[in-house]
Protein backbone atom coordinates (compact mmCIF):
# COMPACT_ATOMS: atom_id res chain seq x y z
CA UNK A 1 0.00 0.00 0.00
CA UNK A 2 1.47 3.41 -0.95
CA UNK A 3 2.58 5.56 1.96
CA UNK A 4 3.91 9.03 2.78
CA UNK A 5 7.45 7.92 2.00
CA UNK A 6 6.35 7.44 -1.63
CA UNK A 7 5.06 11.02 -1.85
CA UNK A 8 8.24 12.45 -0.34
CA UNK A 9 10.36 10.47 -2.80
CA UNK A 10 8.57 12.32 -5.61
CA UNK A 11 8.35 15.80 -4.15
CA UNK A 12 11.35 15.94 -1.85
CA UNK A 13 11.70 16.56 1.85
CA UNK A 14 12.31 20.30 1.92
CA UNK A 15 10.50 21.92 4.84
CA UNK A 16 9.88 25.65 4.96
CA UNK A 17 9.84 26.73 8.59
CA UNK A 18 9.90 29.90 10.66
CA UNK A 19 10.52 30.62 14.35
CA UNK A 20 7.68 31.84 16.57
CA UNK A 21 9.06 35.40 16.49
CA UNK A 22 8.53 35.75 12.71
CA UNK A 23 5.90 38.37 11.95
CA UNK A 24 2.77 37.44 10.05
CA UNK A 25 3.90 39.79 7.28
CA UNK A 26 7.28 38.04 6.98
CA UNK A 27 5.61 34.62 6.98
CA UNK A 28 3.07 35.71 4.35
CA UNK A 29 5.87 37.09 2.18
CA UNK A 30 7.80 33.80 2.47
CA UNK A 31 4.69 31.76 1.68
CA UNK A 32 3.98 33.93 -1.37
CA UNK A 33 7.60 33.80 -2.51
CA UNK A 34 7.71 29.99 -2.25
CA UNK A 35 4.14 29.47 -3.56
CA UNK A 36 3.10 27.49 -0.49
CA UNK A 37 0.00 27.65 1.67
CA UNK A 38 1.63 27.27 5.06
CA UNK A 39 4.82 27.10 7.09
CA UNK A 40 5.73 24.96 10.05
CA UNK A 41 6.78 26.82 13.17
CA UNK A 42 9.91 25.52 14.88
CA UNK A 43 11.76 26.38 18.08
CA UNK A 44 15.10 24.78 18.95
CA UNK A 45 14.60 22.15 16.27
CA UNK A 46 11.17 21.16 17.57
CA UNK A 47 7.81 21.48 15.81
CA UNK A 48 5.67 23.84 17.90
CA UNK A 49 2.96 24.85 15.43
CA UNK A 50 1.80 25.46 11.90
CA UNK A 51 0.76 28.74 10.30
CA UNK A 52 -1.33 28.75 7.12
CA UNK A 53 -3.23 31.01 4.74
CA UNK A 54 -6.37 30.11 6.68
CA UNK A 55 -4.78 31.49 9.87
CA UNK A 56 -4.04 34.76 8.07
CA UNK A 57 -7.67 35.09 7.01
CA UNK A 58 -9.28 34.04 10.29
CA UNK A 59 -6.84 35.34 12.88
CA UNK A 60 -5.29 38.38 11.22
CA UNK A 61 -7.57 39.88 8.58
CA UNK A 62 -10.89 39.02 10.26
CA UNK A 63 -9.63 40.25 13.65
CA UNK A 64 -7.99 43.35 12.12
CA UNK A 65 -4.54 42.60 13.56
CA UNK A 66 -1.40 44.29 12.29
CA UNK A 67 0.57 41.72 10.27
CA UNK A 68 3.77 43.76 10.53
CA UNK A 69 3.86 43.56 14.32
CA UNK A 70 2.06 40.30 15.14
CA UNK A 71 4.31 37.25 15.57
CA UNK A 72 3.12 33.92 14.15
CA UNK A 73 3.72 32.40 17.58
CA UNK A 74 0.62 34.22 18.85
CA UNK A 75 -1.65 32.95 16.10
CA UNK A 76 -0.28 29.59 14.94
CA UNK A 77 -2.17 26.35 15.36
CA UNK A 78 -0.43 24.76 18.34
CA UNK A 79 -2.02 21.31 18.27
CA UNK A 80 -0.51 19.99 15.06
CA UNK A 81 -1.83 16.82 13.48
CA UNK A 82 1.10 14.85 12.02
CA UNK A 83 1.75 11.60 10.20
CA UNK A 84 4.75 9.30 9.79
CA UNK A 85 6.66 8.06 6.77
CA UNK A 86 4.73 4.78 7.01
CA UNK A 87 1.25 6.33 7.15
CA UNK A 88 -0.77 5.20 4.14
CA UNK A 89 -1.75 7.80 1.59
CA UNK A 90 -5.36 6.72 2.01
CA UNK A 91 -5.17 7.41 5.76
CA UNK A 92 -3.60 10.83 5.14
CA UNK A 93 -6.48 11.71 2.84
CA UNK A 94 -8.97 10.62 5.50
CA UNK A 95 -7.19 12.62 8.21
CA UNK A 96 -7.11 15.75 6.06
CA UNK A 97 -10.77 15.41 5.11
CA UNK A 98 -12.06 14.69 8.62
CA UNK A 99 -9.93 17.38 10.28
CA UNK A 100 -10.49 19.88 7.44
CA UNK A 101 -6.76 20.53 7.08
CA UNK A 102 -4.56 20.80 4.00
CA UNK A 103 -1.05 20.44 5.48
CA UNK A 104 0.32 17.42 7.31
CA UNK A 105 3.83 17.53 8.80
CA UNK A 106 5.67 14.21 8.53
CA UNK A 107 7.56 12.94 11.56
CA UNK A 108 10.48 10.56 11.16
CA UNK A 109 12.79 8.91 13.68
CA UNK A 110 14.77 12.15 14.05
CA UNK A 111 11.86 14.58 14.08
CA UNK A 112 10.22 16.56 11.30
CA UNK A 113 11.25 15.23 7.89
CA UNK A 114 8.72 16.70 5.48
CA UNK A 115 5.29 18.18 4.90
CA UNK A 116 2.63 16.82 2.60
CA UNK A 117 -0.44 18.65 1.37
CA UNK A 118 -3.87 17.62 0.19
CA UNK A 119 -2.64 18.51 -3.31
CA UNK A 120 0.26 16.07 -2.93
CA UNK A 121 -2.12 13.30 -1.89
CA UNK A 122 -4.47 14.02 -4.79
CA UNK A 123 -1.64 14.22 -7.34
CA UNK A 124 -0.24 10.89 -6.14
CA UNK A 125 -3.64 9.22 -6.34
CA UNK A 126 -4.25 10.60 -9.85
CA UNK A 127 -0.83 9.39 -11.04
CA UNK A 128 -1.54 5.93 -9.64
CA UNK A 129 -4.94 5.81 -11.34
CA UNK A 130 -3.42 6.89 -14.65
CA UNK A 131 -0.81 4.14 -14.38
CA UNK A 132 -3.54 1.60 -13.63
CA UNK A 133 -5.59 2.78 -16.63
CA UNK A 134 -2.53 2.49 -18.89
CA UNK A 135 -1.84 -1.05 -17.64
CA UNK A 136 -5.46 -2.09 -18.14
CA UNK A 137 -5.55 -0.58 -21.63
CA UNK A 138 -2.36 -2.41 -22.49
CA UNK A 139 -3.80 -5.67 -21.20
CA UNK A 140 -7.24 -5.32 -22.80
CA UNK A 141 -6.13 -3.90 -26.13
CA UNK A 142 -2.63 -5.38 -26.22
CA UNK A 143 -1.23 -1.88 -26.81
CA UNK A 144 2.53 -1.64 -26.58
Q: Model segments located where?
A:
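Tandem CBS (Bateman) regulatory domains
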Residues: 1-13, 52-82, 88-97, 118-144
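The conserved cystathionine-beta-synthase
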Residues: 17-35, 41, 82-100, 107
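Short, charge-rich amphipathic segments
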Residues: 22-33, 65-75, 110-111
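A glycine-centered beta-loop-beta connector
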Residues: 31-34, 39-55, 96, 104-119
